[in-house]
Regions:
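Generic C-terminal helix-cap and adjacent flexible tail
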Residues: 104-107
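N-terminal strand-loop-strand
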Residues: 1-3
Length: 107
């Protein structure tokens, strides 16, 4: 399992990319988007940056996945997502970092 994510198009801002991926992969539109962290997943091998955003004020629409995307959308209560992470059922690094950040800042 993983949170919505994607590659930024040339000239696209990071927030615009986050909004587009959220809409494309989940059908959700955020009233507010706040960058919570930038991290480097593999410093020794690349200069890749990942920008994590907290989306709030969500409204539901229809997802619009790319032709080559195969999505299995599932909504989990936060406590269940924490348990899944602790059991090793969530292994995606950006998702784990995001869940840990949220747990740390929203007790």
């Amino acid at each position: 399992w993983e949170i919505p994510a994607g590659k930024r198009e040339k000239g696209q801002s990071f927030p615009a990319c986050a909004r587009a991926e959220l809409k494309q992969e989940t059908g959700l539109t955020a009233k507010s988007l706040k960058e919570i962290m930038v991290f480097h997943p593999c410093n020794a091998f690349s200069n890749e940056e990942q920008h994590l955003y907290l989306a709030t004020g969500l409204t539901r629409g229809k997802d619009q996945p790319d032709e080559d995307e195969f999505l299995n959308l599932q909504k989990f209560p936060l406590e269940k997502a924490y348990k899944m992470m602790e059991k090793g059922e969530i292994t995606d690094a950006k998702t784990i970092i995001t869940l840990q950040w949220y747990r740390l800042h929203h007790k």
